[in-house]
Regions:
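Generic, well-ordered alpha-helical scaffold segments in large soluble proteins
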Residues: 71, 92, 96-99, 121, ...
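Alpha-helical support elements that line or immediately flank enzyme active sites
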Residues: 151-162, 272-277, 281, 405
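A helix-coil-helix interface module used to build multimeric assemblies
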Residues: 31-232, 237-243, 305-306, 321, ...
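Glycine-rich cofactor/substrate-binding loops
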Residues: 32-63, 67, 128-129, 310-490
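Short, conserved catalytic/metal-binding motifs centered on acidic residues
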Residues: 18, 141, 282
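Intrinsic disorder/low-complexity segments
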Residues: 1-30
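Charged, flexible cofactor/metal-binding loops and thiol motifs
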Residues: 174, 182, 188-342, 349, ...
Length: 490
């Protein structure tokens, strides 16, 4: 079916000749162009191909047909169509939808767009009654409706995928809430933390991403249908009835705004860009951690590849692709922003370019989320290597300074003494834990035997008792918070 296209690529569906013979030839198609009012001249084949968008917007066939069914019902309710005509139209549309979903009917790549295809197919099936469907609407509000309906469904799909990644992160974080590793700043070993807390940081980033998707969905939840081309309609329509029938909570209150803005696309794409930024940062760490230089984790073979020439390689290609595809999503967002920035109200044909950008953006984000959840779930941590790394780099130096401060030494003085001791250790190829007490006392008389407990990595982690910190109680609170979020949204 045209609606299933996870890759985001424009899919060339087989040419449909029409069971009842419509659009048999290009000439007949031109003669039956539904917008051919003023002009009788034929457009060139090149212009027709250039103007066509069905290869992109064809995926919205279900939304287009659903919207048309609701429109026919509204026209009948308001007395603009007879109930008999509306029933015939709705029945014809239901048949088209069923045939598209089953594969009995395929999109015609010679059609200009999905709206023209559906209307022409409807007319071919039920005759002139089908020509009444477009009363009191324009393709301008029709495409805005289709896009909102389609993207509302995509938001729900994205949210489900975000939850799956959060769940994988939570499971790994729970298993490694006490696994000590070095925390980094500037990619330099900084302070001891737990692997669980590191993973929970990404879980909480994605929680906010989930919320941004929800926010985008709330602002998208207004129906543009009935705005017509730009100024509304002279017919006594009921836009609220039609909106409610389609599951919207409100209508676009200004007809110009309803047909001419795509900020709902931009907002969703911005949320996708942030999701991808977070996935990219996580991917970068997975790439680093799985390297021989770190050896903190091992990615499952199902999410890595080998080399065509180097037999020892296990390449983190899936993580690298998530990182690489982030730039693609950014490009989609910038492309649509650039398209919209200079457009006067109301509709302009430039806006046909919105769908390729937003579809690719959403498709790519979904694909990366789909790969990330199982890749994280199957990841194997190497706690022993994390601990070895934490034992190097003097990441307990801050705790040494804190020890002195708690003994009454001003922090800046304590900071200086701690730095001098680190320099001494480097010069003598040793570590803080192995320096004799006599050496410590040459720097300050306040040092006692208790300092060795204070600068042990386990103590360093346990003493981080502040809310949000890496201490056991704090990490457990973070785990509980993420678990509550998952329970509330799954």
């Amino acid at each position: 079916a045209a609606g299933n296209n996870p890759s985001g690529a424009s899919r060339q569906l087989p040419l449909h000749k029409g069971a009842l013979g419509f659009l048999q030839t290009r000439k007949e198609y031109i003669m039956n162009k539904l917008w051919a009012g003023r002009s009788e001249a034929e457009t060139s084949a090149l212009a027709d191909a250039f103007n066509s968008s069905i290869a992109v917007d064809g995926r919205m066939y279900q939304q287009d047909i659903t919207g048309s069914m609701a429109h026919a019902a509204m026209l009948a309710k308001c007395g603009i169509l007879t109930q008999a005509d509306a029933d015939q139209i709705i029945g014809g549309l239901a048949g088209i939808l069923a045939d598209l979903q089953s594969g009995a009917l395929q999109l015609d790549m010679q059609a200009e767009d999905i709206h023209m295809f559906v209307e022409a197919e409807l007319t071919s099936r039920i005759g002139d009654v089908g020509k009444k469907l477009h009363t009191a609407r324009s393709r301008n509000d029709q495409v805005a409706l289709d896009l909102r309906l389609y993207l509302k469904d995509e938001i729900a799909a994205l949210q489900s995928l975000v939850l799956a990644v959060i769940s994988s992160l939570h499971a790994q974080a729970s298993a490694h809430k006490d696994t000590i590793m070095p925390g980094y700043t500037h990619l330099q070993r900084a302070q001891p933390i737990t692997f669980g807390q590191q993973l929970l940081a990404y879980a909480m980033m994605l929680e906010r991403d989930y919320g941004r998707l929800a926010d985008a969905g709330r602002r998208m939840d207004a129906s543009p249908i009935g705005c017509c081309a730009l100024a509304g309609t002279t017919y006594p329509t009921d836009r609220v009835f039609e909106a409610q029938k389609l599951g919207f909570s409100a209508i676009c209150e200004n007809s110009l705004d309803g047909v001419s803005d795509r900020d709902f696309c931009v907002e969703l794409m911005s949320a996708c860009a942030l999701i991808m930024m977070h996935l990219s940062r996580l991917s970068e760490e997975l790439i680093l951690w799985s390297s021989w230089e770190f050896q903190f984790i091992e990615l499952d073979s199902g999410f890595t590849t080998g080399s065509s020439i180097m037999p020892q390689k296990k390449n983190p290609d899936m993580a690298e692709l998530c990182r690489g595809k982030t730039g693609r999503v950014y490009g989609d967002l910038i492309a649509l922003l650039t398209t919209l920035k200079g457009l006067p109200l109301a509709y302009n044909k430039d806006m046909q370019e919105d769908k390729e950008a937003v579809f690719d953006c959403v498709d790519t984000t979904k694909l990366c989320l789909q790969i990330m959840a199982p890749m994280l779930a199957s990841m194997k941590a190497k706690p022993e290597n994390m601990l070895l790394a934490a034992q190097k780099g003097f990441i307990n130096a801050t705790d040494l300074a804190d020890y002195l401060t708690k003994k009454g030494v001003p922090f800046r003085s304590a900071y200086k003494i701690s730095g001098q001791l680190v320099a001494y250790c480097i010069a003598h190829d040793t570590v803080l834990e192995q320096l004799p007490l006599e050496t410590y006392k040459t720097y300050s008389d306040v040092f006692e035997d208790d300092l060795y407990i204070e600068i042990s990595l386990k103590t360093c982690v346990a003493r981080r008792i502040s809310a949000g910190g890496t201490g056991p109680a704090s990490v457990q609170a973070q785990l509980d918070s993420v678990a509550a979020f998952l329970a509330a949204h799954q």
